[in-house]
Regions:
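Active-site-proximal specificity loops/subdomain of glycosyltransferases
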Residues: 1-30
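Small-molecule pocket liners
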Residues: 17, 56, 95-96
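A structural signal for short coil/turn segments at secondary-structure junctions
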Residues: 28-29, 53, 141
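Short aromatic/hydrophobic "clamp" motif used to bind/position activated sugar donors
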Residues: 33
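Catalytic metal- and UDP-sugar-binding loop of GT-A-like glycosyltransferases, i.e.
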Residues: 36
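Conserved donor-nucleotide/metal-binding helix-loop-beta segment in metal-dependent transferases, i.e.
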Residues: 40-81
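Catalytic core and acceptor-binding pocket of nucleotide-sugar-dependent glycosyltransferases
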Residues: 88-184
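Long, low-complexity C-terminal extensions of enzymes
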Residues: 166-210
């Protein structure tokens, strides 16, 4: 119940990811862990990601400038909790991938819990969902000398659809491991991949997915 928010809160269900990671840390024994959104397709092994987990917490860094609407709102939330030094410019991390060693994730989730409690004490439930909490915790983690790294070598967020014409090569040239397909891509491309698997029992070849 640590991250319980009103049902009508924007991105209310996304807060469940914080609860899920906290539960896994408390109830499962493991060396390293990675939490992924469900609207993803993993196309390569995660061997290199596991190597980095021992050295840092890994999060997907969203390529947003400090003034981008969502990024600025996340920073304003932090300003409300820590007015000294405001205005802050937090790095915008997404919640589609959170990975690290058990020790590093335990420390990081403690920061998440404390930061969310401070937000709630100020009467703030971020409309930006779990991402606001990851970002605040990551900022504090870096200030404390506990590294947080961009996981963009392993995952990328591909917004596709009528409003997005996206050109990229990182799915096949020095390819990322995980394709994150939110929004329209979840309703079309990801569904086509799944339907192919359901019919044949194997995923389509990568050249067809691309």
């Amino acid at each position: 119940t640590t991250y319980r928010v009103p049902a009508d809160t924007n991105w209310a269900l996304a807060y469940y990811k914080l609860c899920a990671m906290a539960w896994v840390l408390e109830n499962r024994d493991f060396t390293r862990a990675a939490m992924l959104d469900l609207d993803t397709f993993t196309q390569r092994p995660l061997d290199d990601l596991w190597r980095e987990c021992d050295e840092a917490v890994l999060l997907y860094q969203v390529p947003h400038a400090a003034s981008q609407t969502m990024t600025a709102a996340i920073s304003h939330c932090f300003d409300a909790v820590e007015p000294d030094g405001a205005p802050h410019a937090l790095t915008h991390f997404g919640g589609e991938l959170v990975a690290g060693s058990k020790a590093r994730l335990t420390d990081f989730m403690s920061l998440c819990r404390d930061y969310f409690k401070e937000l709630q004490a100020k009467g703030i439930t971020p409309r930006e969902g779990d991402e606001a909490v990851w970002c605040g915790a990551a900022y504090r983690s870096l200030l404390a000398g506990k590294p947080v790294r961009a996981a963009n070598a392993y995952i990328f967020r591909y917004w596709l659809g009528v409003h997005f014409y996206y050109v990229s090569t990182n799915y096949t040239l020095d390819p990322v491991c995980i394709l994150h397909l939110p929004g329209a891509a979840k309703d079309r491309q990801l569904k086509l991949i799944y339907n192919g698997y359901a019919r044949r029992g194997v995923f389509p070849p990568l050249n067809k997915i691309y």
